[in-house]
């Protein structure tokens, strides 16, 4: 009985958290914001998976992230599993990075990047 209770606790504990977000920054999770996103995810023990349309990426790999091309206004699902999953998800909800608001600002040499909130929560499936 003790073994089955332990297995049940381990199984329940291995649940994940996931949320859907809209990317707010332009041009999306490209070079620097993408790199900062990956570094943030790597600073936690939990695994991170990002889903965009029918594509999936490892949130701790910049190359994997680039392959799914997460652009501004894309809807992404972030799935986190591990001991610190809730802490990391909370951090990502509030994450800010140096970026542009839109393409016009990006193309305008007179406009510099500013600190912006990267994501908007679309649905909360914790």
What residue ranges belong to the model's regions?
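C-terminal structural segments of small proteins and small subunits
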Residues: 79-111
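Glycine/charge-rich, flexible interdomain linkers and switch-proximal surface loops
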Residues: 57-60, 108-114
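Short, low-order "capping/linker" segments at domain edges
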Residues: 110-126
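Beta-strand secondary-structure signal
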Residues: 18-20, 75-79
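Amphipathic alpha-helical interaction surfaces in cytosolic regulatory modules
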Residues: 27-47, 55-74, 86-90
């Amino acid at each position: 009985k003790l073994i089955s209770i332990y297995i049940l606790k381990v199984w329940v504990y291995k649940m994940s958290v996931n949320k859907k977000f809209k990317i707010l920054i332009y041009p999306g999770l490209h070079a620097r914001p993408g790199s900062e996103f990956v570094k943030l995810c790597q600073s936690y023990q939990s695994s991170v998976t990002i889903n965009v349309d029918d594509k999936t990426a490892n949130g701790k790999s910049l190359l994997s992230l680039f392959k799914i091309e997460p652009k501004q206004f894309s809807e992404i699902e972030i799935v986190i599993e591990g001991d610190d999953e809730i802490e990391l998800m909370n951090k990502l909800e509030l994450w800010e990075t140096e970026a542009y608001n839109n393409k016009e600002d990006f193309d305008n040499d007179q406009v510099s990047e500013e600190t912006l909130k990267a994501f908007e929560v679309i649905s909360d499936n914790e």
